[in-house]
């Protein structure tokens, strides 16, 4: 059995600080290859996700890793000891990137040939897994697996002319199959994930399966509580399915540093391990790696790598029904407020520092079936914008919990163990002065302000959260938030950008 990675380094551009080795503030090109090597060698991460979604991808990464760092990769075999996993564009959703999908798939046999030359015949398959984002059905991942088998691996048998086959020209193509990891991001897809996985299992018959649960995009689209509970439902469903099919499923969770995006940081990783029992692989995003002291980062990654994997909590039907009900109530409260704040979010997001060479890319919210009225930036910029205007998104929609009876509240608390801790961490950055300023700058309606105030009041009076600055850093952040809004109002944008950067440094994450 292969090693299942416990940590996966990603290229999410959520870091406030720029790492010392980067040639510029925007990490791109050769720097991303170096970053992949450092993730393995310096930080001890088991796996690197190589992202072809929403950016120009370097499909020669394996060649560069093996040729630039031969000593390391002779000792640590790529595909056996450490892993490189491609994140594809979803051709069903990202029409402009369909050919990037094809190009990335076509590069997999090249990596095989390179590894054969480097390691010797049959030693390793360096890239054998791909991640498909925004997966909503089993047909999508079945199509990806079959596309590779039929359109890539089997093309060596095509006859060109007069008995001459493709393999006579370019050699045989390996590997013959790849493993597809669905990245599930929509609320309904997360809550019905068993249908996606079981359908794929019946057709493809894999020996095991890795399933990637998004935690960040669902929070942006449906609210933080909906995202957490949807992941809990998904974990329960996956473990039940694993038992019934007698088939190993290894969940991955995509988590960032701030509470809204998962709260996995070098200072909070133990609580995240406690919260998401049953998860095998945790994403180590850029803020985790670059916004904290190196020794603390390396120690945290080592602890995650060596932590015990507890079984996921299996939900009874009545518990699952309650959690589903909460996600609906919460989202109904959360989404209209976000729609009203969309102009503010979009205006602020374009001023945040850029950390990756990514193409412009709207988030799922822009074409979400449940709230298709507005387009928003990607989750990192979304979160950074709301923190910067002094309204952490973790607080939005909270008062919907007032609809729960005592039994429902108990079920909620049992299934979101660190709810109060996450909320308190975010609430330190709430700025009371924001209301008047955002009303003045973006003409935010009294109704929206009143709804946010209800959420704030509920967090304070019912949950017992202390709002606003409670230490030097949070008070400084609140002051910077007011200064940012004032400078933005006066169109002094260079100062606005400076305050945004300073706040990100305090949070230890852009968003």
From Swiss-Prot:
UniProt cross-references to InterPro entries, sorted A to Z: PEP_COase_arc-type, Pyrv/PenolPyrv_kinase-like_dom
One Gene Ontology biological process: tricarboxylic acid cycle
A Pfam family: PEPcase_2
Keyword line: Carbon dioxide fixation, Lyase, Magnesium
Reaction(s) catalysed (UniProt annotation): oxaloacetate + phosphate = phosphoenolpyruvate + hydrogencarbonate
GO molecular function list: magnesium ion binding; phosphoenolpyruvate carboxylase activity
Root EC class: lyase
Domain of life: Archaea
This enzyme's EC code(s): 4.1.1.31
Cofactor list: Mg(2+)
Quaternary structure and partners: Homotetramer.
Family: Belongs to the PEPCase type 2 family.
Biological role: Catalyzes the irreversible beta-carboxylation of phosphoenolpyruvate (PEP) to form oxaloacetate (OAA), a four-carbon dicarboxylic acid source for the tricarboxylic acid cycle.
Protein name: Phosphoenolpyruvate carboxylase
Organism: Saccharolobus islandicus (strain L.S.2.15 / Lassen #1)
């Amino acid at each position: 059995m292969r090693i299942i990675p416990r940590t996966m380094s990603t290229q999410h551009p959520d870091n406030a600080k720029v790492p010392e080795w980067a040639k510029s503030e925007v990490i791109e090109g050769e720097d991303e290859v170096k970053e992949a090597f450092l993730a393995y060698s310096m930080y001890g991460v088991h796996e690197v996700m190589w992202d072809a979604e929403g950016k120009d991808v370097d499909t020669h990464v394996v060649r560069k890793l093996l040729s630039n760092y031969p000593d390391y990769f002779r000792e640590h075999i790529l595909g056996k000891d450490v892993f490189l996993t491609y994140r594809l564009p979803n051709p069903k959703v990202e029409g402009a990137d369909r050919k990037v999908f094809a190009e990335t798939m076509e590069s997999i046999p090249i990596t095989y040939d390179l590894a054969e030359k480097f390691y010797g015949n049959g030693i390793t398959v360096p890239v054998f897994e791909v991640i498909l984002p925004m997966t909503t059905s089993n047909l999508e991942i079945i199509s990806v697996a079959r596309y590779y088998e039929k359109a890539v691996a089997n093309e060596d048998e095509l006859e060109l002319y007069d008995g001459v086959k493709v393999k006579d020209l370019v050699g045989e193509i390996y590997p013959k199959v790849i493993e597809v990891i669905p990245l599930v991001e929509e609320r309904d897809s997360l809550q019905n994930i068993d249908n996606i996985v079981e359908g794929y299992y019946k057709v493809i018959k894999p020996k095991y399966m890795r399933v990637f649960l998004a935690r960040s995009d669902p929070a942006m689209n449906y609210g933080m509580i909906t995202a957490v509970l949807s992941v809990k439902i998904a974990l329960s469903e996956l473990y039940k399915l694993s038992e019934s099919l007698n088939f190993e499923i290894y969940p991955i969770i995509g988590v960032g540093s701030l509470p809204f995006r998962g709260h996995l940081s070098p200072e909070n990783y133990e609580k995240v391990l406690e919260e998401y029992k049953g998860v095998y692989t945790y994403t180590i995003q850029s803020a985790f790696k670059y916004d904290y002291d190196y020794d603390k980062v390396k120690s945290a990654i080592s602890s995650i790598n060596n932590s015990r994997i507890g079984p996921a909590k299996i939900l009874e039907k009545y518990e699952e029904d309650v959690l589903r009900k909460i996600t609906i109530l919460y989202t109904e409260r959360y989404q209209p407020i976000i729609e009203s704040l969309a102009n503010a979010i979009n205006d602020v997001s374009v001023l945040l520092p850029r950390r990756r060479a990514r193409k412009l890319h709207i988030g799922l919210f822009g074409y979400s079936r449940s709230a298709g009225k507005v387009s928003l930036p990607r989750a990192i910029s979304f979160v950074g914008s709301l923190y910067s205007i002094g309204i952490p998104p973790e607080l939005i929609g909270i008062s919907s919990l007032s609809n729960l009876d005592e039994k429902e509240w108990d079920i909620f608390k049992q299934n979101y163990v660190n709810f109060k801790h996450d909320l308190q961490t975010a609430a330190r950055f709430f700025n009371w002065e924001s209301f008047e300023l955002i009303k003045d700058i973006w003409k935010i309606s009294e109704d929206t302000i009143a709804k946010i105030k209800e959420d704030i009041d509920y967090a304070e009076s019912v949950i017992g959260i202390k709002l606003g600055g409670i230490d030097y850093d949070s008070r400084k952040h609140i002051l910077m938030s007011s200064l940012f809004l004032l400078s933005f109002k006066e169109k002094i944008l260079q100062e606005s950008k400076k305050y945004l950067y300073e706040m990100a440094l305090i949070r230890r994450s852009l968003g």
